[in-house]
Regions:
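Short, Lys/Arg-enriched N-terminal segments with co-localized hydrophobic residues
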Residues: 1-21
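Transmembrane-helix signature of 12-pass secondary carriers
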Residues: 18-298
Length: 298
């Protein structure tokens, strides 16, 4: 009958509109999630960037401090300076769990971003507020290494909290894939900084350093490599300020993880984040699972 056909048509139209709305919501949720994860994996990129930047800068840095008059820059000092960031990595990784639990995942990552930025700036200009520029000495070397340790703290925090953040905010069906993006970002960060160092050096000559025994070395081409010795290594370390500043700013605009929000009793905020990512139907069920898990562990 005409009446039955009309009802069927209305029902079909309603189902079609509902389907379109659901598809739009899913697309919006995926885009929102991808934006969040892309910001978070910048922490992984900085992990790789900070640990690999020394590879291009170490010869210029070594030649620079070999010009010091108040101490001898031996192989010991060179090895310590090249690896001092690892001290910060140990500190950062040891503190990551405490900070993530007390400050939250988001604020801990903001702090890591600030550490990366301060380290990049201080490693580029370690003389700032301490010594006259361009005068290599033991105090300047110590200050430089302090800044590298600060960057290492950022690495230690990012290495633990970035995958934690992604794992807690991603839906279970794609969680493994999204967490793996962080691992890719670490390697990509190392690759990027190799090219950055290459382009910074450009047509300039890198210093050639030869061992003369007993932990001592000499520069074979100091005049030709003057730019790399005085300036090049500074630009290499300073280049990290770009991704570090970007990370520190953008991470302020992503949400805290639903798990942490549930841990501190902010269920409404947790439900809002879950709804944006998973939709209305799944959000309440996921929140209930999170709360049950949190309750069991506490």
């Amino acid at each position: 009958s005409p009446h039955g056909e009309m009802l069927f048509s209305i029902s079909l139209e309603h189902k079609f509109k509902t389907y379109i709305i659901m598809q739009q919501n899913q697309t919006s949720s995926k885009a929102y999630l991808i934006r969040i994860v892309m910001v978070a994996v910048l922490g992984g990129l900085l992990f790789g960037y900070d640990t690999a930047v020394i590879s291009g800068a170490e010869k210029g840095l070594q030649a620079f401090f070999m010009g010091a008059t108040d101490f001898t820059y031996t192989d010991f000092w060179h090895g310590f300076t090249s690896s001092s960031a690892l001290i910060g990595c140990i500190i950062g990784s040891a503190l990551s769990g405490v900070l993530a639990s007390n400050w939250g995942r988001k604020r801990t990552l903001i702090f890591a971003g600030v550490m990366f930025f301060v380290s990049a700036w201080g490693s580029m200009c370690p003389e700032t507020m301490v010594l006259p520029e361009g005068k290599p000495n033991l105090t300047l070397l110590i200050v430089f290494n302090i800044y590298r340790v600060i960057g290492g703290v950022g690495v230690g925090l990012a290495s633990a909290v970035c995958p934690m953040y992604i794992g807690e905010i991603a839906p279970s069906n794609i969680r493994g894939m999204l967490v793996s993006w962080n691992q890719f970002a670490i390697i990509f960060g190392q690759l990027v900084v190799y090219f950055v160092n290459f382009f910074i050096l450009g047509d300039h000559i890198a210093p050639a350093i030869q061992s003369i025994g007993n932990g001592m070395n000499e520069i074979l081409n100091g005049g030709e490599a003057a730019w790399a010795i005085e300036t090049g290594w500074r630009y290499m370390f300073g280049s990290e300020m770009v991704p570090a500043g970007l990370f520190a700013v953008l991470i302020c605009f992503v949400p805290e993880t639903p798990r942490y929000l549930a841990m501190v009793g902010q269920d409404d905020k947790a439900l809002h984040v879950l709804t944006r990512i998973n939709g209305d139907l799944e959000a309440e069920n996921i929140l209930s699972e999170i709360k049950n898990t949190v309750t069991e562990k506490t």
